[in-house]
């Protein structure tokens, strides 16, 4: 074999390796896209949302089919963080609410809830999640109403506030409750 033959053979080998690698990358990209589409479809089934943009927004906020059941609890988590930290009473009530909604201990949704109770989510998460909840409620696919969610938030606000039961809801919590009630009911914020 001449040097030219060796170089040509090496060139063909490198070219074949390149295209095999590109094929694998393309197949993997297609698998990821199919998995993401499947995840969005599952979240759509669980939330009643069908608009692809809303489902992508859910995904962009980090929700998965395993954690999307937490979406209606996000406003209550926002209220719990109103005064800069989550109290033991608020944590206990939020955990109890999660359990009544089928979120079992040790599941991805439970771990996400724990993370949100330990570290305050970004304000953007609260704003976008509230908008998504309003869209979810407008589908009529859920028994829950905006009023139900606001009452849940009020229960969280009252969970650990006030000495001797006086002023159980702080000014910060009251402000968030007013804003959430308006937003969830599709009214302009006061």
Task: Cite the ranges covered by each PLM segment.
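Small-residue-enriched hydrophobic alpha-helices in membranes
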Residues: 2-79, 85-190
